[in-house]
Amino acid sequence: NGQYGPEVGTQNHFRYTEKLGKPVIFLINQLDSEKCDYHQVLDSLINIYGPKVIPIQYPLNEGPDFNSLIDVLLMKKYSWKPEGGAPIIEDIPAEEMDKAMEMHRALVEAAAENDEELMEKFFDTEALTEDELRIGIRRGLATRSMFPVFCVCATKDMGVRRLMEFLGNVVPFVDEMPQVHNTRGEEVKPDPNAPTSLYFFKTANEPHIGGVQYFKVMSGKVHEGDDLTNTDRGSKERIAQLFCCAGANRIKVEELVAGDIGCTVKLK
């Protein structure tokens, strides 16, 4: 929250990611708030979570008139019309270049620290290509040695598309993450050809439907009509319907594979 900084929910979610060894990306929202203070919020994140917190963006005009930011990964200025949506991408203004370059160098150094070859190149040239930066950041996310910080005004759709682009292009693939273990302590590899295992993490009750169970496919494949064993109960359950999720919408599918997130209905 751009007004109040890290709150109890932030800290609780961070503890969960720490326990599960998951990547972390911080998102500073409500940049259009009258009381927004980006730099104070960023300082709070660094004070709590340390130097792993690395800003990717900073706003140019936080507050009620917010409509532009600098992206120090792509070294571009992003701005939006009042209705938000697709950004206008331009060169960084001359008066912001020194600040942007300083933050870019810090980002490059943090990314290079995650790979020996990248570190050697950084020592030689003090620069990395855009693709090399993505590799370094991806490894930093997987090992939790980097916590990137992004800026958005979600209600006005400013910055959201750039964040989604980053998630699609940079966030680690499931097979690049540390291995997980099942309740028996056995390693579960995200292999679509391995035996099927699902991890159910949420149940929601919806009108006219009842229970909707959300899960991640940890290994193998799951199909509509499959009979799987509920390891908590020791009983068989049939996956009568299978969906993938797109926001509030459910899309019926016939198969999901390791790494996919989906949902089903009316399990016992």
For every predicted segment, state its role.
Residues 1-268:
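Structural and coupling elements of P-loop NTPases
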